[in-house]
Design a protein with these regions (language model features):
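Alpha-helical elements of Rossmann-like donor-binding domains used by nucleotide-donor carbohydrate transfer enzymes
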Residues: 34-37, 73, 104, 108-111
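Short beta-strand/loop motif that positions the catalytic acidic residue
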Residues: 51, 57-59, 63
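Short glycine/threonine-rich loop-to-helix capping motif typified by GTGT followed
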Residues: 66-67, 97
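Alpha/beta-hydrolase
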Residues: 1-49, 53
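Short alpha-helix in the alpha/beta-hydrolase fold that links the catalytic acid
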Residues: 53, 67-76
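A structural signal for short secondary-structure junctions
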Residues: 49-52, 76-78, 87-88
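Catalytic active-site module of serine/aspartate enzymes centered on a nucleophile-bearing elbow/loop
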Residues: 81-120
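Hydrophobic/aromatic beta-strand patches that form the interior of the parallel beta-sheet core
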Residues: 56-58, 84-85
């Protein structure tokens, strides 16, 4: 559900054992209410269209936690958005994925930052 890379997932499990306070559990009702309030704000006409900051959205159609259809739809409302969408080769945690996916993500992030926030 989170990654296809067993070693990276086991690393995460090891951190949870070492530091149980960093493990996320299910969302609280407050979290759900705040998430819904945020969604309502973003659904307002003009809300996303007003964003001037360049944004890179990374997603996968195989994500079982995030709606990729919504990511793609919202990216079309963002005037300065770029997307990188994976298929079944990637799960939710793209930066903890198998090297092929992770490397593509990092390369795209580097290129995006070089374009929009170049080093002095």
């Amino acid at each position: 559900m989170l990654t296809h890379d067993d070693d990276r997932y086991e690393d995460e499990v090891a951190w949870w054992a070492l530091r149980p306070e960093v493990k996320l559990g299910p969302p609280s009702w407050h979290w759900v209410e705040r998430a819904m309030a945020s969604i309502r704000l973003l659904e307002r006409p003009g809300a996303l269209e007003a964003v001037q900051t360049p944004i890179l959205l990374l997603a996968t159609t195989a994500d079982q936690l995030v709606s990729t259809k919504r990511v793609i739809a919202d990216s079309k409302r963002l005037l300065h958005a770029e997307t990188l969408i994976f298929g079944k080769e990637a799960a939710h945690e793209l930066l903890r994925e198998a090297d092929g996916v992770r490397d593509q993500c990092l390369k795209r992030i580097d290129a995006f930052l070089d374009q929009h926030a170049p080093r002095p």
